[in-house]
């Protein structure tokens, strides 16, 4: 008996999301469980399970688009276009994200809140590693949150409601961890919501393309990776850590929130709605 998956479109978005997640788990668990049981290296275990999860996520998206929405080019619908223009948007986003991080740390250095240090490792390797990590994180999270999830939300809700739900779920997803770790990192929640808003506005600014959000997300991760892994800074202690960032995480400090707020305000003012109208949505 052939199952008519197009009937899922008649159900509200929470039901569709649950069905998709259950299908993904059904595909992932048979491969993930043996890895958890047999692989002793925790780093290798995490890498293998995450790679398998994301490969199956992309595989399932293709089926979801064809069988549920009758859209054979679902990735283009999400804004993942392999075009020159989208590539330029990725580079623009990388530049904006990297510049934002460098300006934040540069300003704190000028104010005497941190001290710049000589790198403890070969900086060229860190820069290349950071670029790869940043692009990987940006691609994965933006296809998930500003591609699939945002599309599902916008099918049922008005644009501004979908915007806020997407941003909040994006922030909440970073707290799927033990309670102690949640409490430890909770101060970064406002900055993550602002980043989620920024990414949706960035996609709308570029008329639904994912290039800018992928690049911007990647650039932020890239910049922080270079400074953090390269051990380029040391806080002077002239101001409390809630100003510069609790646990040395700029997203957990007032300065990080202010910078993310400024970035959100700027990109939100630039974004273009699907109707070509300027302004925040």
Task: Name each region found by the language model.
Residues 16-70, 80, 88-93, 126-129, ...:
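Alpha-helical transmembrane segments in multi-pass membrane proteins
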Residues 113-120, 176-184:
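Membrane-interface helix caps and helix-loop-helix hairpins in membrane proteins
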Residues 2-5, 36-49, 72-143, 150-156, ...:
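Juxtamembrane helix-loop-helix connectors linking adjacent transmembrane helices
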Residues 218-279:
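C-terminal membrane module of polytopic membrane proteins
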Residues 133-134, 138, 159-175, 193-196:
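Small-polar-interrupted transmembrane alpha-helices in polytopic inner-membrane proteins
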Residues 162-170, 211-223:
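Central hydrophobic cores of alpha-helical transmembrane segments
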Residues 140-165, 201-209:
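Membrane-interface helix/loop boundary segments of multi-pass membrane proteins
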């Amino acid at each position: 008996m052939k199952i008519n998956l197009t009937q899922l479109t008649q159900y509200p978005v929470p039901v569709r999301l649950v069905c998709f997640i259950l299908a993904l788990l059904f595909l992932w668990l048979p491969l993930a469980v043996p890895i958890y049981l047999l692989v002793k290296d925790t780093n290798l275990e995490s890498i293998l399970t995450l790679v398998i999860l994301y490969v199956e996520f992309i595989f399932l998206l293709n089926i979801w688009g064809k069988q549920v929405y009758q859209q054979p080019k679902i990735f283009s619908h999400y804004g993942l276009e392999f075009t020159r223009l989208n590539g330029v948007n990725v580079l623009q986003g990388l530049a904006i994200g990297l510049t934002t991080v460098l300006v934040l740390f540069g300003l704190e250095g000028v104010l005497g809140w941190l001290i710049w240090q000589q790198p403890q490792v070969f900086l060229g390797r860190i820069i290349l590693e950071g670029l790869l990590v940043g692009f990987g994180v940006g691609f994965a999270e933006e296809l998930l949150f500003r591609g699939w999830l945002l599309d599902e939300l916008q099918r049922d809700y008005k644009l501004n409601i979908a915007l806020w739900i997407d941003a909040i779920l994006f922030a909440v997803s970073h707290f799927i961890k033990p309670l102690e770790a949640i409490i430890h990192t909770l101060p970064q929640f406002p900055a993550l919501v602002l980043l989620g808003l920024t990414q949706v506005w960035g996609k709308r600014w570029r008329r639904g393309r994912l290039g800018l959000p992928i690049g911007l997300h990647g650039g932020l991760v890239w910049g922080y990776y270079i400074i953090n892994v390269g051990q380029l800074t040391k806080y002077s202690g002239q101001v409390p850590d809630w100003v510069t960032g609790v646990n040395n995480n700029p997203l957990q400090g007032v300065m990080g929130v202010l910078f993310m707020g400024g970035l959100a305000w700027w990109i939100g003012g630039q974004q273009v709605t699907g109707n070509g109208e300027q302004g925040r949505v």
